[in-house]
From Swiss-Prot:
PROSITE patterns linked to this entry: BETA_AMYLASE_1 (PS00506), BETA_AMYLASE_2 (PS00679)
Entry EC no(s): 3.2.1.2
Molecular function GO terms recorded: beta-amylase activity
Catalytic function, reaction form: Hydrolysis of (1->4)-alpha-D-glucosidic linkages in polysaccharides so as to remove successive maltose units from the non-reducing ends of the chains
Pfam families from the UniProt entry: Glyco_hydro_14
Protein name: Beta-amylase
Species per Swiss-Prot/TrEMBL record: Vigna unguiculata
Length: 496
C-alpha cells in the first residue's frame, strides 16, 4: 500500500458503515457480540473509519419517563472502541418499522404510546384522520403533556442522559458524531410516504398536519394573516396519486395561489423551527464535547423534475424550480455548528423509471451545493443497498464533485459517507472485494488514516449555538443559486 501523502490526504473522505438495525434488541439486549466482533474486525481491516448506529428512544426509555437503561449500548460501544473504529450515534426518536428496509420493529416507548391512546393527536395525522405512530407531531413540541414534560424536553433529557452515561466514549473521542433525529427515519421531514399506510413509489404522498395541535396553529397563523377563512388543503389527493390528478398539484394548481403559497410556507416553516429548537437543545446537551452535531435530510427524488415537486412538498421541503427548499435548512443548521447529512448519493437519473420524473443527481447537486454555500459540512449516505461499481462510482463522484487535487484540498469534498448497511451480503467475498476498493478510492488512494487532523477533520469542542435566525431571514435563502459544477464521472473509479 502507498504511504500517506500529505497533499492527497486532504482529499480523503472517511467511510462509515451503518450497523444492522437489530444490533441491540427491542428488549435492550446486545444480541450477538461475538458475531458482530468478527464483522467489525473485517471492516477495520478494510480500512473503514467507523460505524453508525441508531440509539433507539424506544429501547432506552421504554420502562417509563426518565428511566433510562444504557447498559446494552455501553457494551456495544466498548466493542466498537476495542475494534479501533469511530462511532456516529443517532438519537433515534422515531419508530423502526414501516419504512423502506425496516426489518426490525422498535416502537417509540410504550408510556408515550399510552398517552396517545387517550390523545391520538400527539401523532402526525393525514386528512382522512389516519395516525402515524412513528414520530410525535411537531404540534406537541412545546406541549407539556408527557407526564409534565414537552416533547422537546423529553428529547433534551434523553440527550443529556446519553452524554452523562457515555462520557467515557465522548472523552476518548470514540464518538465523533451525534446525529439528531428530527422525524420519521430520523429525517427532518413529515411522514408523508408511509409504507405501512399503503404508500408505494412513486406516489406523491400526503400532507401530515391534520392533528388538532397543528390544525390550531395553522388557523391562528391564517387569522394573523387576515385570512381566518383559510383551511388546510382538501384538494391534494392521496398517497398514490400522480400530481396532475389533484387540484392542488396540477398545472396552475392550488400550490401556485396565494392560499397555497401561504400553506406551503407555514408547513415548511414548522419543520425549520422544529429542527432549530431541537438542535439548540442538542447543542446545549453536548456543549464542550469534541463531537459533530448533524441532522439528516431525506432524498425525495421522485417528481423532482415535475414543476410541482409534489413529493418534496408533502414531506415539508418547499422546493420549486424558482424556490430553494433546502438552503434555508442549511442556514438554520449553520447557527448550531452542525452539519447536514443527505441521502440517495448512489442514484443516477438513468436508473429511474421516466414516469416518476425523478432527478436524484440534480437533487444531490442542489442540496450539497446549498450546504457548501452556507459554509456547513455536508455528509451523506446511499438510500438503498448496492454492491456494484456503478453505484460506488456515483458516491465517489458526489463525495468529490470536481475530483481530487494532487496539490492540496479539492474544490469541494463531502465530510464523510456512511454506507448502508453492514450485512452478510456485504461481506460476501465478491461484494466485499469491491467495497474494499471503494474505501481506498474514497480515501484518495491513501491508507487508513487514524488521525482526522491529517485530513483537516480535527473536531474542536462544540461551541454554543449562535443567536436564533428569524424564519424570514432563513427564507431569504430560498433564492435559487445554480449548483456548483459536477464532473460527469469520478476520476477515482473503483473499476478504473
Amino acid at each position: 500500500m502507498a504511504s500517506l501523502d500529505k497533499n492527497m490526504l486532504l482529499n480523503y473522505v472517511p467511510v462509515y458503515v451503518m450497523l444492522p438495525l437489530g444490533v441491540v434488541s427491542v428488549n435492550n439486549v446486545f444480541e450477538d457480540p461475538e458475531g458482530l466482533k468478527e464483522q467489525l474486525v473485517q471492516l477495520r481491516e478494510a480500512g473503514v473509519d467507523g460505524v453508525m448506529v441508531d440509539v433507539w428512544w424506544g429501547i432506552i426509555e421504554q420502562k417509563g419517563p426518565k428511566q433510562y437503561d444504557w447498559s446494552a449500548y455501553k457494551s456495544l460501544f466498548q466493542l466498537v472502541q476495542e475494534c479501533g473504529l469511530k462511532l456516529q450515534a443517532i438519537m433515534s426518536f422515531h419508530q423502526c418499522g414501516g419504512n423502506v428496509g425496516d426489518v426490525v420493529n422498535i416502537p417509540i416507548p410504550q408510556w408515550v404510546l399510552d398517552i396517545g391512546e387517550s390523545d391520538p393527536d400527539i401523532f402526525y395525522t393525514n386528512r382522512s384522520g389516519t395516525r402515524d405512530k412513528e414520530y410525535l407531531t411537531i404540534g406537541v413540541d412545546n406541549k407539556p403533556i408527557f407526564h409534565g414534560r414537552t416533547a422537546i424536553e423529553v428529547y433534551s433529557d434523553y440527550m443529556k442522559s446519553f452524554r452523562e452515561n457515555m462520557s467515557d466514549f465522548l472523552k476518548s473521542e470514540v464518538i465523533i458524531d451525534i446525529e439528531v433525529g428530527l422525524g420519521p427515519a430520523g429525517e427532518l421531514r413529515y411522514p408523508s410516504y408511509p409504507q405501512n399506510q399503503g404508500w408505494v413509489f412513486p406516489g406523491i404522498g400526503e400532507f401530515q398536519c391534520y392533528d388538532k395541535y397543528l390544525k390550531a396553529e395553522f388557523k391562528a397563523a391564517a387569522a394573523r394573516a387576515g385570512h381566518s377563512e383559510w383551511e388546510l388543503p382538501d384538494d391534494a389527493g392521496t398517497y398514490n396519486d400522480v400530481p396532475e390528478s389533484t387540484e392542488f398539484f396540477k398545472t396552475n394548481g392550488t400550490y401556485l395561489t396565494e392560499k397555497g403559497k401561504f400553506f406551503l410556507t407555514w408547513y415548511s416553516n414548522q419543520l425549520l423551527n422544529h429542527g432549530d429548537e431541537i438542535l439548540d437543545e442538542a447543542n446545549k446537551a453536548f456543549l464542550g464535547c469534541k463531537v459533530n452535531l448533524a441532522i439528516k435530510v431525506s432524498g425525495i427524488h421522485w417528481w423532482y423534475k415535475a414543476q410541482n415537486h409534489a413529493a418534496e412538498l408533502t414531506a415539508g421541503y418547499y422546493n420549486l424550480d424558482d424556490r430553494d427548499g433546502y438552503r434555508p435548512i442549511a442556514k438554520m443548521v449553520s447557527r448550531h455548528h452542525a452539519s447536514l447529512n443527505f441521502t440517495c448519493l448512489e442514484m443516477r437519473d438513468s436508473e429511474q423509471s421516466s414516469d416518476a420524473q425523478s432527478g436524484p443527481q440534480e437533487l444531490v447537486q442542489q442540496v450539497l451545493s446549498g450546504g457548501w454555500r452556507e459554509n456547513i459540512e455536508v455528509a451523506g449516505e446511499n438510500a438503498l443497498s448496492r454492491y456494484d461499481a456503478t453505484a460506488y462510482n456515483q458516491i465517489i463522484l458526489n463525495a468529490r464533485p470536481q475530483g481530487v487535487n494532487k496539490d492540496g484540498p479539492p474544490k469541494h469534498r463531502m465530510y464523510g459517507v456512511t454506507y448502508l448497511r453492514l450485512s452478510d451480503e456485504l461481506l460476501q467475498q465478491s461484494n466485499f472485494d469491491i467495497f474494499k476498493k471503494f474505501v481506498v478510492k474514497m480515501h484518495a488512494d491513501q491508507d487508513y488514516c487514524e488521525d482526522p487532523q491529517e485530513y483537516n477533520h480535527g473536531i474542536p469542542p462544540l461551541k454554543r449555538s449562535e443567536p436564533k435566525i428569524p424564519v424570514d431571514v432563513l427564507n431569504e435563502a430560498t433564492k435559487p443559486i445554480p449548483p456548483f459544477p459536477w464532473d460527469s464521472e469520478t476520476d477515482m473509479k473503483v473499476d478504473g
